Amino acid sequence: MQFEPGTKFHYDNSGYFLLGAILERVTGKTYETLLKESIFGPLGMKDSGYDHHADILANRATGYQQELGGVENAPYLDMSLPYAAGSLYSTVEDLYKWDQALYTHKLVPNELKQRLFTPNLEHYGYGWDIRTIPTDEPGAGQTVISHGGGINGFNTLEQRLVGDHDLIVIFNNTPGANLGEMAKGIRAILYEKEPAAPKRPLVPDLGETLVNRGVDAAVAQYRELKRTNPHGYNFDEHALNQLGYMLLEKGRNADAIAIFRLNVEEYPKSGNVYHSLAEAYAKDGQKQQAITNYRKSLELDPKNQNAADKLKQLEQK
């Protein structure tokens, strides 16, 4: 156990896996059956269910993933493995039925809904993130109840704008796009504001350069794009982080280190970028450099338990 229950927040799919197992133990029914009987059936959600790879589903979306040289099919995943943490399929139309039912007593009584939608630690309620839209964003002051998720080849975001009973659902079958920014643009349209122009992702362009011309050319391209087109691309720290981990997974440790070092240069106040650089140094066998960067990560983000654990392991070797 990482900490005393109720003292900190840490999202973990294992919690939802256990909740599914508890439901099965208490009711004597499978999780899939419970979903059909309690939610999908009563709400007429005919295009939602527990996914089985062998089933033929009309219009089933295929998942892809961004790699250095382009887009590839996402690796196969046996959907019995994520279980209650992520084995469902659905549609925007069905999720709208579910969303609207949450404003009634069809699924959950008011007392339980109050608990569901009350934030506890770090804005998180019972399975929902509950926040107020900042004053500088469209829909300022409204409560947004949301959740996102991802699995091989897919990522999603749902935002419930409870003041107006509006719903934003984004399904993406090539993970990597900033769905939060997309949702912000949709909110702008809903509230008759001008949405910000979409920004191009960095990974496809830099990835192609990495494959064809090497890491030095990719770093130079990044600097040139930021100089000449600062508003046209998404230059947040996650873009370079994603690129670095792609390289790390392919065993290109030195190239990954170069990309992570660029990210540290760009975002020196982020504990996460130092954490990533430390991981790359550790994988490359550069123990002291890994220790130095894990320490810096913890200095900037003392709550980073993973960095603390990795640092302890390295210092004990």
Model regions: which residues?
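Short, surface-exposed loop or secondary-structure junction motifs
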Residues: 1-152
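Short, gly/Ser/Thr-rich active-site loops of penicillin-recognizing serine hydrolases
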Residues: 133-137, 141-142, 174-240
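Helix-start (N-cap) detector for alpha-helical repeat units in TPR-like alpha-solenoids
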Residues: 237, 271-272, 305-306
